[in-house]
Amino acid sequence: MIAGKSVLAFVMAGGEGSRLHPLTAERSKPSVPFNGRHRIVDFVLSNLVNSEIYSIYLLVQYKSQSLIEHTRRAWVMSPLLPHHFVTVVPPQMQHGPEWFQGTADSVYQNLHLVELVKPDLVVVFGADHVYRMDLRQMIEFHIATQADATVAALPVPLEHTSSFGIIRTDSAGRIRDFREKPESAEPMPGRPGHALASMGNYVFSADLLVDALRRAHSRGGHDFGKNLLPAMAERNRVMAYDFTTNRMRGIRDYEEPAYWRDVGTIDAYYDANFDTLGEFPKFCMSNPHWPIYANPDQTEAAQVHDGHIRTASLGAGVVIRRAVIERSLLRREVVVEEGAEVVDSIIMDRSVIGKGARVRRAIIDQYNFVPPGMKIGYDPEADRQRFHISESGVVVVGKGQLKP
């Protein structure tokens, strides 16, 4: 209960994540590893649980097995508390032989779960962002403003508006116009060069959400941003919640205020990982007041057998043998052999960097064996023939692409 209201959460975790390919070749975007031992989905789930929202349905679709397995291992709630659960929900085809047709349709196809739980409020959040947020503050705002729906929002540069739902509000914060990914947008009053963007996170009064979903479905509308919210903004009281006002305990002075990243591209994903690195990171993964939970790891501690290490994150079970590691993140059970160099790179679980190999500005997905002496990130033309290269030049080696 929050402010006397019962709350049910739907997490939309069915995204295909095509712009994150090849990291999403065998997994969905929310299941992509992040930092030392997390998955992207862990951020929204941690925000919900830390906000005392314990009734959570995780809506999955594309390449969901990795996400299902992670949820089963990392997000087990007490069976003694019936309203404490993180339950994975694949498409049930309740209304015919169709997968989820859009974000709103994923919730529409599961309205029976709303009727089962009978909450006062329903929160609908995405699963592919890196941030901390106390949802209780947004819910209290929703109640205080007597909103039918509330959209979490923050300013974005005008050149990025085509990637977001763009909001226009009146002086009281009520949404008067909602356009999904427009080619251009007007600047915010008092913020030249910026527009107010939806974060894809919503709070709804339950009865009104059910009614709005049924209306949208009857008109062939399947998406929150394209269909449901623009229609609700015309009929109902829909408010914008300013994410920058969300207060979080434990944030250090050097961290970026109201940190939030959409990690939907390789470059955005790469940059967000490195935002967590260093003595004064923009986003510190460690905050005892608001932990980001992860799969409990029983692996042995990392081992370093000589070498040069500077500004690095080493996961459990990492072994480094007389190697050079600079400004890099190494996840569980990575092995870096003698004479190898890893610089400005992300090396994922159980990959091996062979003797004398050199890796620079790259993402090496799980279960790869970089052969002795191989160079990755030093010759763009040679790398492009074998691997994926992002717009900014980050080399991505797909899961298990390099075999022993």
Curated annotation (Swiss-Prot):
Pathway-wise, it operates in: Glycan biosynthesis; glycogen biosynthesis
Cross-referenced Gene3D superfamilies? Hexapeptide repeat proteins (2.160.10.10), Spore Coat Polysaccharide Biosynthesis Protein SpsA, Chain A (3.90.550.10)
For the ligand (alpha-D-glucose 1-phosphate), the binding residues are 165, 180-181, 198
Keyword flag 4Fe-4S: no
| Signal peptide residues on this chain, from the entry's feature table | none
Query: Which family does the entry's similarity section mention?
Result: Belongs to the bacterial/plant glucose-1-phosphate adenylyltransferase family.
Official protein name in the record: Glucose-1-phosphate adenylyltransferase
- Native organism is Aromatoleum aromaticum (strain DSM 19018 / LMG 30748 / EbN1)
Q: What is the lineage of its organism?
A: Bacteria, Pseudomonadati, Pseudomonadota, Betaproteobacteria, Rhodocyclales
